[in-house]
Amino acid sequence: MKTAQFYVLFFCWKAIWCNGCMLTNITISVEREECEFCISINTTWCSGYCHTRDLVYKDPIRPNVQKTCTFKEFVYETVNLPGCAKQADSLYSYPVATACHCGSCDTDSTDCTVRGLGPSYCSFNERKE
């Protein structure tokens, strides 16, 4: 009986920790103001769960850093936006995550807000695939 309980606990632990932060395929909308439309492209980004906690008693000396699923490494890829005006720059570079980890959110390169615009937001009504 103890062996069965051990295996149940082990698989529950594995399901929680191993299915955490990982690369995920997403579709994002890219746009340029000069082109006046959006296109959808596929890329990879980090998504998942990280072990975190919110302390009941806040300690002003020790900051409470929440861990989030974020990129560890990424590269930029470039796409040519079709239909732009001749004088407009039609090249658009976007990030592609290559590795993920649980860490603090880097506000210099990432939208860390709870209610961001989202990857499919488009300023223009017309969208091209």
UniProtKB/Swiss-Prot annotation:
Entry-listed glycosylation sites: N25, N42
Signal peptide region: 1-20
Subcellular location: Secreted
InterPro entries: Cystine-knot_cytokine, Glyco_hormone_CN, Gonadotropin_bsu, Gonadotropin_bsu_CS
A Pfam short name: Cys_knot
SUPFAM superfamilies per record: Cystine-knot cytokines
Recorded GO MF terms: follicle-stimulating hormone activity
GO cellular component: cytoplasm; extracellular space; follicle-stimulating hormone complex
UniProt keyword annotation of Glycoprotein present: yes
CDD domains (alphabetical): GHB_like
Major location category of this protein: secreted
Paired cysteines (S-S): C21-C69, C35-C84, C38-C122, C46-C100, C50-C102, C105-C112
BP-aspect Gene Ontology terms: follicle-stimulating hormone signaling pathway; G protein-coupled receptor signaling pathway; regulation of signaling receptor activity
UniProt entry keywords in alphabetical sequence: Disulfide bond, Glycoprotein, Hormone, Secreted, Signal
PANTHER family per the UniProt record, alphabetical: FOLLITROPIN SUBUNIT BETA, GLYCOPROTEIN HORMONE BETA CHAIN
The protein's assembly and partners: Heterodimer. The active follitropin is a heterodimer composed of an alpha chain/CGA shared with other hormones and a unique beta chain/FSHB shown here.
Family listed: Belongs to the glycoprotein hormones subunit beta family.
Biological role stated in the UniProt entry: Together with the alpha chain CGA constitutes follitropin, the follicle-stimulating hormone, and provides its biological specificity to the hormone heterodimer. Binds FSHR, a G protein-coupled receptor, on target cells to activate downstream signaling pathways. Follitropin is involved in follicle development and spermatogenesis in reproductive organs.
Protein name stated in the entry: Follitropin subunit beta
Organism from which the protein derives: Trichosurus vulpecula (Brush-tailed possum)
